[in-house]
Amino acid sequence: MGILKTILAASLVFGGASSIAVQAEAEQIGYGRLIVNDFLGDGQDRWRSGSIVGSHLYGQPWGGQRPEGFGDLIEMRIMGQVIAPDNLQSPDPTDRPYAGALSIGAHTHFERSGFDIALGADLTLVGPSSGIGDIQTWLHNAFSVAEPSDTVLNNQVGNKLALTGVAEVGYIYELSENARLRPFVEARAGDETLLRAGFDFTLGQFGHDELLVRDPVSGQRYQTTYQNRPGWSFLAGADFAVVQSSIYLPASSGVTIEDTRERYRIGMNWQGESTSVYYGATWLSPEFTGQDEGQVVGAVRIRFDF
């Protein structure tokens, strides 16, 4: 996947200057966020333990579809996540190491010949310097939950800085007024390097004429622009990835990475006049050879318009 990484990096570098110029003239036109946590899925606190992602959109007023120009719509994204062994107090030596990651990035969303395209980059800080371990310790203390032990934190993935390029291309098939199917392909190179293909199915108005952004951990998509059409929506999706590397599973940890991954997800959204509630669940296949089972993570978003 070396060629893939080179192509992604080049496109991001050469597109960066024009994107910054557009953003300087643009206004904020949307926002979105999603909380993902293992406890909200299978009730555990392990592996892909928890994350929160937030997006702010800049560009011309949203007209119901992506612009055709590269850089005309910019998403600024920030994300923090915790990756942990199964036992935060006395981990199995064959389990994955603890990792805290904090990232910030810019992504552009546009349309070409009917295809939805997202292309961007994130700068990710991994390790104790991210402060994620301290935040989790504070939160667990506040809620009287077992915190990561000194052994876990002292053996976490060391400080690293990774530039990650991400590209996704999808195409929407309108099956009916309320049903849509969107197959997609994704390439990622940096903190994790992989190729992924999958689909998203929606029954209802969720995402119709709205910009949806994909959460990197769960694969769930969340709204960043809103048409506020009342009613229920139901979602399902799946994807398969071929994985080359992950800085969250370094060879020095003694853990062997699985070379494929699968994700299967469902979700539902209720949209009222001024309030919406989203919940989704995703089954994640094992990511390393010592992981004896998959896990289910839950995703939630509650939005109020005042």
Where are these regions (language model features)?
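Short glycine/proline- and aromatic-enriched beta-strand/turn motifs that initiate or cap beta-hairpins
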Residues: 23-64, 69-73, 78-90, 239-250
